[in-house]
């Protein structure tokens, strides 16, 4: 009840207060109205002085009440609220143009700096796509980090750096001017500058500078490159060295050039001033400038010498007649024309001696299909693989070539052995057969140089009949060549016409081979098949006894040769199945790793419960090399194990089984227990380089430390004549480099085997050997013995941090003095301006004048700096910067073959004047008129003069780089920088790495 009586009372009180407030507001309005009327009456009827007094009192009252609207809490005048400073509006067109500039730059980098050397070792089209994706990932990560950078802090640090630099330069200039009256030399100015301020650690000596640049590149790649790229030690070492020596150091040298600084200022600020006058708009597309006009056809006639009789003619050697309406061909095509005419006689000469090569009809050994073709003992086409086998494709063009080649094969009467390396052909021409004497000589060399390797040839008798039938098939005269099925026409469209060094082996006796036209032979890589793949006819055809080197010596082990076929399991195959034949060598340890990895997968564990693996099959057998009976028993059981796994679709299509069978990977890589993430770029580069070395040096060095046996051990082992004959014709392929990638002491193994097989020491004289030993001793003395495990390339943290000591201390003091002040940038800018005004306007440098300027113009300058930084870092500007950089490297979109001629002193002086005028245009016109044109010009001249010393500019570049790395959150990872290139700075270790890779 009490609550009910209280609530009406409270409601009455609130209602009465509301009424009183309304009355008071109405009274105020009445008072104001009366006051205005009274003033009007006084103005019209009474004294004018009284009106002036009343108006002055009202102005004072308004100023007191309205001060909060103009002045902030700090007591500064906010003029920016009355002066509008516009920023660049967001423009989708600018974003699109920036993306285009990035894509063009990436494509030009890949075209001129990546594919220029990669095409010399491989023509894998997927490499370009992988490289482009990796570089785009790097750019995306860089843009993400740049988007979260505190622009306020960046501007503060840069202004502080400029202020410290300008002050140090003025002091150094005064110190050198006092010492001597003659003109100051650049070296003397740099010495005086170093006495005033501590130079960047990278400027101590050239070696330290290279080390510092290498560490920065390594850090940037580690943080920005998407995983798993550059995870391998060798790959990252190569990329770091290439970028450091060919990109970063030349770029720093270019940026430190005073003339280049003038050009940059003219290009940026002149364009910026023009855009400000015309209105903000995105930069126009420059696609017309980037792509020079190239005529579509040229009157090009290439005359070729007539080929010897009995050799098939090639369309590439026929005269080519092209017409053109263009008045003159482009220089690039003229150079290509000269190169073709100049290289053609040499290529024909190489063709005569049998050392020519081609990628058009060249047997390609870079794919994963025939990575172990050298040990294809059981293949019925092993002898036929020594021939020049042409790819059967549709069309009159290739059909004529195949018929000519088969006719040449039929007339030769002798087979040319290639020792597993494939036929060698000139580009655009097919292979030729060597005379019989060359064949016999090649076989004799093969017998003498072949390593001693034990190979089981249990299936040899079964395959001899197949070999005879296929040989008879080729000997049939006037037999038309079968055309390639229509399902493989896409190969002709892509222009990829490569051959494998060996024809695929036909199935075993369970599926006898038919004529060549009864099956579709695919010589394409199945690294990225169009559909699921069915594994069939899997068998372990033989064993190889090899050796590996460890700390105690050589230890033998057994490799099991696994062969299988793959068929694309597609519903739209229209009756024609695409067959591919694979061979891979695996040791027993890798079978155990396969079983372990399958058991660790929860989704696959249920499928292998009833499959007996190696652990269950051989509980009592030792791990070492065993006698032939146990090896034969193990071979049959391991074959049964693999067949059971492939019979289960879920396991057969699993990543583990396909990696074990080297279906989508390189067969040279070992199958380890824990999979090591290697990017496709690293795999393709390693595969291409290794295959190129195999082709270039087929017999110079052993392919693995287990390939060659000593003569004493060979003599101590009883062998039959049949095995000796088989071993003299075959050698162990390089498909088992894999243990070197999976064992801790891999480098020592590869280094040892390459030095052991190196024949350089056999031709060195005694004096050469002594000089070599002396050089190695000196290199070993250079290496720090006290810290052998420390990464020499890893830049010490003090190198990065100490370069910013002065700037960081100043920034910390500013942050401590006013961490939340609204005019931090303006305060730093005023300090920088005082250095410029001290000589011309000393009356402006007094303390009272500084406080007055800070109160009146502080917030306005702060706002102006923020807007200018936003405008200079907008997408329109980034597109312009990237375009300028790209045009400086690729003028007209083409990388110049020769360096540009040096600029004359007159050109440099003219550019300096233009840069000075561009800086003058940055200031508003009314401010220039107030301060004086000549005095402003003298101040800006002092700024340009401080950038005329290349060493000082280099010091500033490194300091600025440290600031950017810190704000990009990269400098915090210096201590975590992986020792991926630990041998890069040590000459002795560098040699070791170069040999081991």
From Swiss-Prot:
Residue spans of biased composition, Acidic residues class: 422-435
CDD domains: PX_SNX19 (cd06893)
Effect of residue 587 to Q: Abolishes interaction with membranes enriched in phosphatidylinositol 3-phosphate
Region of interest: Disordered: 313-333, 413-437, 697-728
Gene3D superfamilies linked to this entry: Phox-like domain
Location of the PX domain: 538-668
Keyword Secreted listed: no
Molecular function as annotated in GO: phosphatidylinositol-3-phosphate binding
Regions of compositional bias (Basic and acidic residues) in chain numbering: 714-724
Biological processes annotated in GO: chondrocyte differentiation; dense core granule maturation; establishment of localization in cell; exocytosis; insulin secretion
Keyword Membrane: yes
Bilayer topology annotation: Peripheral membrane protein
Keywords recorded for this protein, A-Z: Cytoplasmic vesicle, Endosome, Exocytosis, Lipid-binding, Membrane, Protein transport, Transport
Record note on quaternary structure: Interacts with PTPRN.
Primary role: Plays a role in intracellular vesicle trafficking and exocytosis. May play a role in maintaining insulin-containing dense core vesicles in pancreatic beta-cells and in preventing their degradation. May play a role in insulin secretion. Interacts with membranes containing phosphatidylinositol 3-phosphate (PtdIns(3P)).
Family in the record: Belongs to the sorting nexin family.
PANTHER family membership: SORTING NEXIN, SORTING NEXIN-19
Entry note about domains: The PX domain mediates specific binding to membranes enriched in phosphatidylinositol 3-phosphate (PtdIns(P3)).
Name of this chain's protein: Sorting nexin-19
Organism: Mus musculus
Taxonomy of the source species: Eukaryota, Metazoa, Chordata, Craniata, Vertebrata
Gene that specifies this protein: Snx19
């Amino acid at each position: 009840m009490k609550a009910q009586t209280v609530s009406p009372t409270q409601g009455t009180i609130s209602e009465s207060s509301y009424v009183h407030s309304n009355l008071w507001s109405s009274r105020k309005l009445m008072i104001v109205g009366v006051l205005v009327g009274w003033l009007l009456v006084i103005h019209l009827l009474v004294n004018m002085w009284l009106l002036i007094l009343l108006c002055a009192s009202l102005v004072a009252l308004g100023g007191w009440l309205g001060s909060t609207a103009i002045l902030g809490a700090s007591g500064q005048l906010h003029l920016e609220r009355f002066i509008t400073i516009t920023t660049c509006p967001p423009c989708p067109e600018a974003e699109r143009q920036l993306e285009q500039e990035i894509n063009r730059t990436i494509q030009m980098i890949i075209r001129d700096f990546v594919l220029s050397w990669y095409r010399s070792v491989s023509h894998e089209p997927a490499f370009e796509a992988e490289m482009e994706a990796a570089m785009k990932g790097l750019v995306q990560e860089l843009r993400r980090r740049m988007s979260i950078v505190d622009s306020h802090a960046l501007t503060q640090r840069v202004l502080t750096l400029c202020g410290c630099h300008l002050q140090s330069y003025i002091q150094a200039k005064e110190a050198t001017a006092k010492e001597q009256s003659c003109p100051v030399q650049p070296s003397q100015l740099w010495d005086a500058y170093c006495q005033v301020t501590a130079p960047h650690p990278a400027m101590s000596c050239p070696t330290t500078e290279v080390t510092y640049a290498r560490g920065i590149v390594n850090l940037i790649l580690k943080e920005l490159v998407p995983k798993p790229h550059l995870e391998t030690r060798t790959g990252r070492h190569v990329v770091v060295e290439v970028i450091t020596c060919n990109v970063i150091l030349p770029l720093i040298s270019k940026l430190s050039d005073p003339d280049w600084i003038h050009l940059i200022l003219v290009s940026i600020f002149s364009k910026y001033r023009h855009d400000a006058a015309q209105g903000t708009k995105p930069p126009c597309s420059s696609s017309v400038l980037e792509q020079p006009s190239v005529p579509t056809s040229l009157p090009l006639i290439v005359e070729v010498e007539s080929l010897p009789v009995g050799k098939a003619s090639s369309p590439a050697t026929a005269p080519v007649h092209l017409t053109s309406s263009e008045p003159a061909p482009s220089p690039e095509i003229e150079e290509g024309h000269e190169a073709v005419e100049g290289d053609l006689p040499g290529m024909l000469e190489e063709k005569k001696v049998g050392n020519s090569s081609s990628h058009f009809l060249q047997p390609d050994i870079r794919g994963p299909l025939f990575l172990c073709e050298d040990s294809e003992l059981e293949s019925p086409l092993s002898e036929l693989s020594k021939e020049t086998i042409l790819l059967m494709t549709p069309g009159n063009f290739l059909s004529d070539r195949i018929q000519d080649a088969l006719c040449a094969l039929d007339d030769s009467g002798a087979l040319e052995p290639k020792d597993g390396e494939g036929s060698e052909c000139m580009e655009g021409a097919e292979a030729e057969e060597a005379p019989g004497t060359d064949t016999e000589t090649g076989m004799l060399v093969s017998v003498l140089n072949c390593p001693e390797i034990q190979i089981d040839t249990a299936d040899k008798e079964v395959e001899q009949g197949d070999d005879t039938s296929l040989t008879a098939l080729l000997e049939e005269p006037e037999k038309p060549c079968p055309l390639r099925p229509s399902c493989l026409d896409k190969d002709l469209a892509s222009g990829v016409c490569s051959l494998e060094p060996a024809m695929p082996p036909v199935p075993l006796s369970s599926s006898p081979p038919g004529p060549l036209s009864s099956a579709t032979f695919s010589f394409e890589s199945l690294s990225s098949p169009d559909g699921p793949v069915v594994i069939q006819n899997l068998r372990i055809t033989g064993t190889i006894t090899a050796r590996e080197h460890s700390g105690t010596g050589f230890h033998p082990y057994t490799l099991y040769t696994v062969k299988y076929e793959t068929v694309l399991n597609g519903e739209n195959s229209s009756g024609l199945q695409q067959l591919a034949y694979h061979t891979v060598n695996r040791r027993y340890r890798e079978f155990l790793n396969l079983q372990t990895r399958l058991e660790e997968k929860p989704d696959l564990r249920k499928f292998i419960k009833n499959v007996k693996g190696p652990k269950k099959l051989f509980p009592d057998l030792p791990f070492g090399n065993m006698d032939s009976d146990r090896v034969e028993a193990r071979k049959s059981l391991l074959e049964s194990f693999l067949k059971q796994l492939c019979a289960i679709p879920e396991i057969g299509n699993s990543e583990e089984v396909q990696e074990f069978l080297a279906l989508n990977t390189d067969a040279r890589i070992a199958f380890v227990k824990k999979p090591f993430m290697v990017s496709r770029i690293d795999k393709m580069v390693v595969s291409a380089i290794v295959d190129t070395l195999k082709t270039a040096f087929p017999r110079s060095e052993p392919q693995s430390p287990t390939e060659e046996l000593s003569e004493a051990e060979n003599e101590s082992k009883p062998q039959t004549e049949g095995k000796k004959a088989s071993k003299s014709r075959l050698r162990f392929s390089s498909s088992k480099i894999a243990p070197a990638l999976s064992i801790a002491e891999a480098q020592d193994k590869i280094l040892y085997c390459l030095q052991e097989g190196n024949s350089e020491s056999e031709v060195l004289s005694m004096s050469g050997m002594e000089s070599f030993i002396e050089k190695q001793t000196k290199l070993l003395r250079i290496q720090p013995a006290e810290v052998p495990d420390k990464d020499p390339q890893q830049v010490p943290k003090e190198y990065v941090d100490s370069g910013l000591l002065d700037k960081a201390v100043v920034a910390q003091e500013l942050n401590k003095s006013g961490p939340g002040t609204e005019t931090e940038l303006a305060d730093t800018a005023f300090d920088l301006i005082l250095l410029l005004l001290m000589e011309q306007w000393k009356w402006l440098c007094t303390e009272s004048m500084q406080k007055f300027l800070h109160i009146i113009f502080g917030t306005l300058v702060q706002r102006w700096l923020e807007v200018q930084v936003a405008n200079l870092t907008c997408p329109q500007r980034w597109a312009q910067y990237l375009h300028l950089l790209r045009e400086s490297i690729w003028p007209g979109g083409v990388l110049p073959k020769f360096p540009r001629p040096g600029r004359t002193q007159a050109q440099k002086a003219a550019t300096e004047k233009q840069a000075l005028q561009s800086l003058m245009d940055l200031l508003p016109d009314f401010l220039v008129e107030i301060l004086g044109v000549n005095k402003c010009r003298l101040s800006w001249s002092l700024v340009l003069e401080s950038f005329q010393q290349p060493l000082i500019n280099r010091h500033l570049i490194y300091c600025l780089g440290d600031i950017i790395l810190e704000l990009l959150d990269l400098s915090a990872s210096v201590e975590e920088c992986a020792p991926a290139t630990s041998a890069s700075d040590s000459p002795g270790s560098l040699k070791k790495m170069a040999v081991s890779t």
